[in-house]
Amino acid sequence: MGQQWPAGEIARLILDGFDDYREHFRQITDGARVRFEQAQWQEAQRASAARINLYEEKVAQTRERLLEGFDESLLEVGQWPLVKSAYIALIDLRFDDELAETWFNSIFCSLFSHDLISDGCMFIHTTRPSLRNQPSAAQTRNYRPAGELHLALQAIFDDYRFDVSYEDLPRDLQRLEGQLRASLPDWICKDPQQCIELFSSVLYRNKGAYLVGRIYTPDEQWPLVIPLLHREGLGIQVDAAITDEAEVSIIFSFTRSYFMVDVAIPAEFVGFLKRILPGKHIAELYTSIGFYKHGKSEFYRALIGHLASTDDRFIMAPGVRGMVMSVFTLPGFNTVFKIIKDRFAHAKTVDRKTVIEKYRLVKSVDRVGRMADTQEFSDFRFPKAKFEPECLAELLEVAPSTVVVEGDTVLVRHCWTERRMTPLNLYLESASEAQVREALDDYGLAIKQLAAANIFPGDMLLKNFGVTRHGRVVFYDYDEICFLTEVNFRRIPPPRFPEDEMSSEPWYSVGPMDVFPEEFPPFLFADIKQRRLFSQLHGNLYDADYWKQLQDAIRAGKVIDVFPYRRKSPVE
């Protein structure tokens, strides 16, 4: 039967589904330039969400075509190694073969239960090289200043033109040259072998466009990112020259929306990014350019590789125990694993379905650098020996429907992964006075920037925010988030009688979406000193009118600027 079984036809239909997905992905991505040129910011947000949702839509369509096109023998899992072999032959000459493997995995998982997953039937381990050789000449552009940096910059912007003119290119190039000379060692700008290498395609995200590359000599290199802004009615402005690796890393952060960029050979571009950002895992780099499912595949491979090669064992994550989620981690792997508890604390009114919807919402909204990206997994299987006994006991106690022991294996039926950060409340306990001020200032900015993106965190307690390795404050607990425009911000009405103020119950009605910002200070800060400092830094967050003005701007269609980098000398 094996030779008669239609392995080749099944493989072909799976790949046809992938081609359909890739074509629609390209169409959405290719529209980014026009949206930037025409300042279509709301359309850009919709396109970003549509591209994220596209993957699951096309997987579902391909699954249906398979079920309609083949009889029940399609679900004979023992035959799927033949499909995998036929599929490998079909993708061997493709430029996006690693993405095609992930697509195959998605189709397999849509047809079979996760306990049937094996490397014989799908691509648990890739058959492709993890990184490719240097990008081809067509993928990058090279400029050699030979001591004449201003001429090289002029040549760059002769090549990177748009259908909208630059607002004042001579002014911007002069400022750009000054920033480069200030940020690089003096000798580098005089080195006759200095080269500026830029990726040929422009990267687009939200209201910005980005030239991405590096400055290098035979001995050293620096990343280079040049953000461009479209100042409506004026033209395009060259906004900055960024050469600091930490700052460039933040631009490609797990807290950002995904870039739109025309990439003919994804592995080559990721390899290019990896050379300028060696600290980034390729999972994060694939995700940053919209291939989040392949980023998930690379993350999983890194995880099973870590478990196989170390003595690391799962422990409960540091911090206050959550009322909805239970969080565990591996000390040597920079990730937390979040599961939904079977029973929530009485203070929580959400249910499991709502929590799942909230976490999935985060995937499709603009995270403005202030919400951690998540990956959702089903049926993780780990060796029981990889759990500290106290950790496993707690997980089994709070989530017995999600965490199950099967012999020597622990099955985690459903979880999310997020980048591990230091909880803000723990960070403040050991921070210096200057660090406390900086962290609280960034905490307030995080709340304001989320609000500008039409996101209200709901539960804004310090424990629900984390501090990244770059010192940025990021929100990561999503069970109460909602759109800002759904909230009814109110002032507390004056008491009717003196005894009203002494009552344990409010003397006014409170609706389910009512929020009283005046109540924030004691709710957010038990520490009086921190409460006073935050009032100095961001006291307007305690004013209902501040929030209402933001709501008005959002309802009017205004897309507010949130920059993923320090603006050094913006033009007003």
UniProtKB/Swiss-Prot annotation:
Q: Which InterPro entries match?
A: AceK_kinase, AceK_regulatory, Isocitrate_DH_AceK
Report the SS bond pairs.
none
For this UniProt entry, the molecular function terms from Gene Ontology, in alphabetical order, are: [isocitrate dehydrogenase (NADP+)] kinase activity; AMP binding; ATP binding; phosphoprotein phosphatase activity; protein serine/threonine kinase activity
Any one GO CC term of this protein is: cytoplasm
Tell me one Pfam family matched here. Answer: AceK_kinase
Query: Does RNA-binding count among this protein's keywords?
Result: no
Origin, by domain of life?
Bacteria
Q: What is its main location?
A: cytoplasm
Give the positions the UniProt entry annotates as the active site. 373
GO BP term, example: glyoxylate cycle
Query: Which reaction does this enzyme catalyse, per its entry?
Result: L-seryl-[isocitrate dehydrogenase] + ATP = O-phospho-L-seryl-[isocitrate dehydrogenase] + ADP + H(+)
Q: Which Enzyme Commission numbers does its entry carry?
A: 2.7.11.5, 3.1.3.-
Question: Where does the record place it?
Answer: Cytoplasm
| TM region(s), chain numbering | none
Function (record text):
Bifunctional enzyme which can phosphorylate or dephosphorylate isocitrate dehydrogenase (IDH) on a specific serine residue. This is a regulatory mechanism which enables bacteria to bypass the Krebs cycle via the glyoxylate shunt in response to the source of carbon. When bacteria are grown on glucose, IDH is fully active and unphosphorylated, but when grown on acetate or ethanol, the activity of IDH declines drastically concomitant with its phosphorylation.
For this chain, the family text in UniProt reads: Belongs to the AceK family.
What name has this protein been given in UniProt? Isocitrate dehydrogenase kinase/phosphatase
What organism, scientifically named, is this protein from? Ectopseudomonas mendocina (strain ymp) (Pseudomonas mendocina)
Question: Upper lineage ranks?
Answer: Bacteria, Pseudomonadati, Pseudomonadota, Gammaproteobacteria, Pseudomonadales
